[in-house]
Amino acid sequence: MAAPLRKEHPIFRILNSTFVDLPLPSNLSIWWNSGSLLGLCLVVQILTGIFLAMHYTADITLAFSSVMHILRDVNYGWFLRYVHANGVSLFFICMYCHIGRGLYYGSYNKIETWNVGVILFLVTILTAFMGYVLVWGQMSFWAATVITNLVSAIPYIGTIIVQWLWGGFSVDNATLTRFFPFHFLFPFIIAALAVIHLVFLHNSGANNPFAFNSNYDKAPFHIYFTTKDTVGFILLVAALFSLALLFPGALNDPENFIPANPLVTPPHIQPEWYFLFAYAILRSIPNKLGGVIALVAAILVLFLMPLLNTSKNESNSFRPLSQAAFWLLVAHLFILTWIGSQPVEYPYVLLGQVASVLYFSLFIFGFPIVSSIENKIIFS
């Protein structure tokens, strides 16, 4: 009897080993859906972005008007724009769930997969920031001015790099025209990095909630996990369409519906909600260079997780102290997100400083110390 085409054809064979016959631990929970949801979000963002780019004009005199043209005059342009604008919020929600699952269940022990994932996170942040600038509303313009100006804190070469980024001595037409092609290009780089991420993942094998050896109990990806992923897809699309159709501007800053004006500063400059935790850490340090270092360290600290891990048990499923530390970290992230949306005044500055110190303390001291204590309790 001839083998199925999916097992014989050189291209289909690769797809088959990735999406059909891939053996996975049978006890994977719903938290393992976030990876496939990220893939769906990326596809949606690329497709809607391509159609939006057909009608967008990367010029400071026309950028805001071209966005309004898309909303008013292009067939279903309003739908494309709001799906794209709200899709990035769901993208980051899925990404934070994915990172949180990795921290909780010890995915950082698969070092290559974890490091590529953190790089993916960084590239996604850059992509989203440049896309936010393209609207050329008030908050877009001033956020671009403030965030890019932080690079000037780098000793000796900072000012030169900022002027190179701007294409002049301020955020202007050159800045917008170079941000647009980079924003168009980066999603394809993200897709390539995602493939590398999957290659490393399939090479090392997926972990599972209990961190047990799963070689004795595995199930094929299709039809068990494709069915579960499909349920996640339906829920994600329902959430995205609900946002785009019923609450299209709920997650956008009202200031961004005003055309950019370099002569009028908004009362409170802030990035989109998914960057607020990092923004709160940035402004909690009064020194400019110190704030930039803290901002970058808030993301790069994820690279240190494999080195800081002291636990003999990979997963947190049977480690109550580590579970408490993890949820304390999640609470701090919510607090920092809330503080980032508040004015720079007492008591928000003080709360931000305390939450920032605790954020880094949990990563550098909290998790290793708690894991060492659990090792003594469990294995002594």
Curated annotation (Swiss-Prot):
Cofactor note: Binds 2 heme b groups non-covalently.
Gene, per the UniProt record: MT-CYB
Membrane-spanning parts: 34-54, 78-99, 114-134, 179-199, 227-247, 289-309, 321-341, 348-369
InterPro entries, sorted: Cyt_b/b6_C, Cyt_b/b6_C_sf, Cyt_b/b6_N, Cytb/b6-like_sf, Cytochrome_b, Cytochrome_b_C_euk/bac, Cytochrome_b_N_euk/bac, Di-haem_cyt_TM
Keywords: Electron transport, Heme, Iron, Membrane, Metal-binding, Mitochondrion, Mitochondrion inner membrane, Respiratory chain, Transmembrane, Transmembrane helix, Transport, Ubiquinone
Similarity field: Belongs to the cytochrome b family.
Superkingdom, natural source: Eukaryota
Principal cellular location given in the protein's record: mitochondrion
Pfam families cross-referenced by the UniProt entry: Cytochrom_B_C (PF00032), Cytochrome_B (PF00033)
Binding site for heme b b566: 98, 197
Miscellaneous remark of the record: Heme 1 (or BL or b562) is low-potential and absorbs at about 562 nm, and heme 2 (or BH or b566) is high-potential and absorbs at about 566 nm.
Localization in the cell: Mitochondrion inner membrane
Natural source organism: Strongylocentrotus purpuratus
Membrane topology, as annotated: Multi-pass membrane protein
Identification of the protein by name: Cytochrome b
The keyword rRNA processing is annotated on this UniProt entry: no
Entry binding sites for heme b b562: 84, 183
Self-association and partners: The main subunits of complex b-c1 are: cytochrome b, cytochrome c1 and the Rieske protein.
Cofactor(s) in the UniProt record: heme b
Gene Ontology molecular function: any one: metal ion binding
Gene3D superfamilies: Cytochrome Bc1 Complex, Chain C
Residues that, per the record, bind a ubiquinone: 202
